[in-house]
A protein has these predicted regions:
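Conserved structural position within tetratricopeptide repeats
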Residues: 28-31, 62-65, 108-112, 143-146, ...
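Alpha-helical segment of the N-proximal tetratricopeptide repeat
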Residues: 2-32, 84-109, 113
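Helix-start (N-cap) detector for alpha-helical repeat units in TPR-like alpha-solenoids
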Residues: 2-4, 37-38, 71, 78, ...
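Structural motif corresponding to the intra-repeat A-B loop/turn of tetratricopeptide repeats
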Residues: 16, 50, 95-97, 131, ...
Length: 167
């Protein structure tokens, strides 16, 4: 069985909602053709959808190493790095670090890497709100709403922060 046949089996597994089996098929395709950047990229996407961020980054990096000029692979890796930063920021917040400075830095960096990362905007708004900086919290959440106008949580946060600003 060649790599393309295994990729086809991986897609069949995805359609059957068996992501672990899909990962196995992608890995077999890579074993057959280790220098095929597209296979690493496809496996990375599947890992990312399965919340296996470390492995997703690993294969996205490999895909980009194999095809340095591929902007799709570069953007995908940036999005994954943004997700890593959001995860790290959430850990900082959970640890209740002093005023969330590190979390703010990480979230802003995540937004630079992936300007469409709505979650990063919403968490950043919460961090500002925790510091009683409702003006910045409101501003950040409004940025999120400009990206996704019907996002319910963003609407709720914006209303809450706007109310706090009036008090």
């Amino acid at each position: 069985m060649n790599g393309e046949d295994q990729i086809q089996k991986a897609y069949e597994s995805i359609l059957g909602h068996d992501f672990e089996k899909a990962i196995e098929w992608f890995e077999k395709a890579i074993a057959a053709e280790p220098d095929n950047a597209a296979y690493h990229y496809k496996l990375s996407i599947t890992f990312a959808r399965s919340n296996k961020l470390f492995q997703a980054v690993e294969h996205a990096s490999k895909a980009l190493d194999l095809e340095r000029d591929n902007e799709v692979y570069r953007y995908h890796l940036q999005v994954l790095h943004a997700r890593e930063l959001v995860d790290r920021a959430q850990k900082e917040i959970s640890a209740k670090s002093e005023h969330g400075e590190r979390a703010i830095f990480l979230l802003k960096e995540a937004i630079v890497l992936d300007p469409l990362a709505i979650e990063a905007y919403l968490i950043l708004g919460e961090v500002f709100a925790l510091r009683n900086d409702y003006s910045r919290a409101y501003q950040v959440v409004m940025d999120a709403l400009r990206l996704e106008p019907n996002h319910e949580l963003a609407k709720q946060q914006a209303a809450r922060y706007q109310l706090k600003l009036k008090l």
